[in-house]
Amino acid sequence: MYFPIVALIGRYQDTGLDAPLTALAQMLTQAGRRVLVEAETARNAGVSGYPVADWDEIGRTATLAVVMGGDGTVLGAARHLAPYGVPLIGINHGRLGFITDIPLQDAHDALGRVLEGNYQAEDRMLLQGGVWRGEQQMYSASAVNDVVLNRAGRGGMIEVRVELDGAFMYTQRADGLIIATPTGSTAYSLSANGPILHPGMNAMVLVPVAPQTLSNRPIVIPDSGVLNMTLTAMGRVEIGASVHFDMQTWSDLQPGDRITVQRAPHIIRFVHPEGYSFFSTLRRKLHWNLMPQATDNLE
């Protein structure tokens, strides 16, 4: 049997999630699967009648995690479950949905095919890093999409010295700097004119946000290196600077603080229904104006 124990995870703030989650739980039970509901999802979405589990229990026992919500919901679930190796499948109950690629109305059909073994798996990298003040580590976190260093208030720019494996790259004056994974290259990085990286690439991309020097362009680097970014100045920034690991924020950066970023030792495994195509997702989500040929598989 494929995926005998399935965990359900939903976006806590979403209204109206109880009905589709309950229907999904019923469908899974009828298919002979044991269903676990993540604790906050059960509490806030009102899903009852199924065993409730915290992240650790899900990580130790679940063979598949079904995440209903937007990409942000998947990011949070992925950070929790990546160390356990639990694969995830995303059902879009949000907005754009690059990671939650299954529309809500197709959830039962798509999940049914996956449970029958008609699926393809895709491994993606995470980032890990921290904030150092001298020899003391002030903060640590992981990120699926990106690590973003930016000014926290109005006015002025931040100045950052960037090194890769100890080799000086540049000193950047900008509103911010994005370090994105291939997964994150279609998120904030894309809106800052960064390139799209194929998810199979072993790479990261550094994208400046409103740099002072217009010749400062995004640069793609191997994910095998360690980035060190030292905040050298904050100009006339009124409040300070912050660093964000996905949606996790450290907002007390001071001049001289060092931010380290590198590839995490574990990966995320996403499960897609058979026939999934990254390029098809790009065409749909970004509305690329292609002239398809009759032989093209568009979906």
UniProtKB/Swiss-Prot annotation:
Q: Which Gene3D superfamilies match?
A: Probable inorganic polyphosphate/atp-NAD kinase, domain 1, Probable inorganic polyphosphate/atp-NAD kinase, domain 2
In which compartments does the protein localize?
Answer: Cytoplasm
Keywords per UniProt: ATP-binding, Cytoplasm, Kinase, NAD, NADP, Nucleotide-binding, Transferase
Q: Which reaction does it catalyse?
A: NAD(+) + ATP = ADP + NADP(+) + H(+)
The entry's NAD(+)-binding residues are: D71, G72, N145, D146, R173, D175, T186, A187, Y188, S189, L190, S191, A210, Q248
Q: Name one GO molecular function term.
A: metal ion binding
Asked if the keyword NAD belongs to this entry, the reply reads yes
| Residue positions of the active site | D71 (proton acceptor)
Question: In the Enzyme Commission scheme, what number(s) does this protein have?
Answer: 2.7.1.23
The GO cellular component terms are: cytoplasm
Which cofactor does this sequence's record say it needs?
a divalent metal cation
What's an example Gene Ontology biological process for this entry? NAD metabolic process
Which InterPro entries does the UniProt record give?
Answer: ATP-NAD_kinase_N, ATP-NAD_kinase_PpnK-typ_C, NAD/diacylglycerol_kinase_sf, NADK
Question: Family assignment?
Answer: Belongs to the NAD kinase family.
Classification via NCBIfam families: PRK02155.1 (NF002561)
**What task does this protein carry out?**
Involved in the regulation of the intracellular balance of NAD and NADP, and is a key enzyme in the biosynthesis of NADP. Catalyzes specifically the phosphorylation on 2'-hydroxyl of the adenosine moiety of NAD to yield NADP.
Q: What is the protein name for this chain?
A: NAD kinase
